[in-house]
Amino acid sequence: MATQTSNPQSVYDFTVKDAKGKDVDLSIYKGKVLIIVNVASQCGLTNSNYTDMTELYKKYKDQGLEILAFPCNQFGGQEPGNIEDIQQMVCTRFKAEYPIFDKVDVNGDNAAPLYRFLKSSKGGFFGDGIKWNFSKFLIDKEGHVVDRYSPTTSPASMEKDIKKLLGVA
């Protein structure tokens, strides 16, 4: 389960679990532009989102982009596998080099504290709840939520906003 400081001001105030169950203090990403996304392996949006995210990561990782992927099984049971299976699929099929974290809940009583913060910072069009797999949050270099993108918004269409935050022409 992810933890947080008592009054979080940015995503850097959170600690989450990596795929091996070890704590990761998100402050290690200070100075980076982040995409935080809830992912699923068996969703109709899986191929397009992972493909676009992998391309964006390859293109901008050296300029300071990081993608933090959090598997979630809350939408249609579309992420039923264990974390090892998920990592294997993502790294083999989509050649993902960005971190895949431990499975989380993004809604409800057991929602990860990080996701509670993200949702309270940028509510969606239909309220605060995450509606489906591949909801994306864009985070600036100071750890603040800049924007929220719907599951059907392709990561490639976020490129202009990412470049602006990275300061890349």
From Swiss-Prot:
One of its GO terms (biological process) is response to oxidative stress. InterPro entries: Glutathione_peroxidase (IPR000889), GPX_AS (IPR029759), GPX_CS (IPR029760), Thioredoxin-like_sf (IPR036249), Thioredoxin_domain (IPR013766). It is found in: Cytoplasm. Signal peptide: none annotated. The active site is at residue 43. One of its GO terms (cellular component) is cytosol. GO terms for molecular function: peroxidase activity; phospholipid-hydroperoxide glutathione peroxidase activity. It is an enzyme of class 1 (oxidoreductase). Keywords: Cytoplasm, Oxidoreductase, Peroxidase. Its main location: cytoplasm. It holds the Pfam family GSHPx. Its EC number is 1.11.1.12. It comes from the Eukaryota. It catalyses: a hydroperoxy polyunsaturated fatty acid + 2 glutathione = a hydroxy polyunsaturated fatty acid + glutathione disulfide + H2O. Belongs to the glutathione peroxidase family. Monomer. Has a tendency to form higher mass oligomers. Interacts with FUNDC1; this interaction promotes GPX4 recruitment into mitochondria through TOM/TIM complex where it is degraded by mitophagy. Protects cells and enzymes from oxidative damage, by catalyzing the reduction of hydrogen peroxide, lipid peroxides and organic hydroperoxide, by glutathione. PANTHER family: GLUTATHIONE PEROXIDASE, PHOSPHOLIPID HYDROPEROXIDE GLUTATHIONE PEROXIDASE-RELATED. This is Probable phospholipid hydroperoxide glutathione peroxidase.
